[in-house]
Amino acid sequence: MVMQRTFVMIKPDGVKRGLIGEIISRFEKRGLKIVSLKMVKMSRDIAEKLYDEHKGKSFFEELVNYVTSGPVVCMVIEGDDVVQVIRRMIGNTDPKEAPPGTIRGDYALSKSENVIHASDSIEKAQREMSLFFDKSDL
């Protein structure tokens, strides 16, 4: 196994609904380490950078407005094969496709209010971490 770090963000609906502790607890029970954590109100500029790959898509504006609508909790999480482990733990973007026992399967309300974001590759994780954390935070 290879020790990796990834970026995870609890979205405004997860924060508003009081799911922060439950979500973090799931990661810790899985043996993953929270390296850094902060609650922020994301600027539009950062949101556009975070979701840059979706620029030009029909849902881009709604997504940016949503993630800037309230506080989010940003985390850097470390563990063996952590990118894939967390992707499996959070489940499909569409909660109808996310099995029970996954974070989205248990808590997501819709495709847009789906509680959580997690990087889907090491490269994206590094880019996304750098949007929210300085090297000294890690």
Swiss-Prot record:
Question: Which reactions appear under catalytic activity for this entry?
Answer: a 2'-deoxyribonucleoside 5'-diphosphate + ATP = a 2'-deoxyribonucleoside 5'-triphosphate + ADP; a ribonucleoside 5'-diphosphate + ATP = a ribonucleoside 5'-triphosphate + ADP
Taxonomic lineage is: Archaea, Thermoproteota, Thermoprotei, Sulfolobales, Sulfolobaceae
**Gene Ontology cellular component terms for the protein in this record:** cytoplasm
Named cofactor requirement(s): Mg(2+)
Q: Keyword Transcription regulation on this protein? A: no
This chain's protein is named Nucleoside diphosphate kinase
Q: What is its main location?
A: cytoplasm
Keywords of the record, alphabetical order, are: ATP-binding, Cytoplasm, Kinase, Magnesium, Metal-binding, Nucleotide metabolism, Nucleotide-binding, Phosphoprotein, Transferase
- Annotated ATP binding lies at 11, 59, 87, 93, 104, 114
Write down the superkingdom of origin. Answer: Archaea
Quote the subcellular location field of this record: Cytoplasm
| Matches recorded under Pfam families | NDK
The scientific name of the source species is Saccharolobus islandicus (strain L.S.2.15 / Lassen #1) (Sulfolobus islandicus)
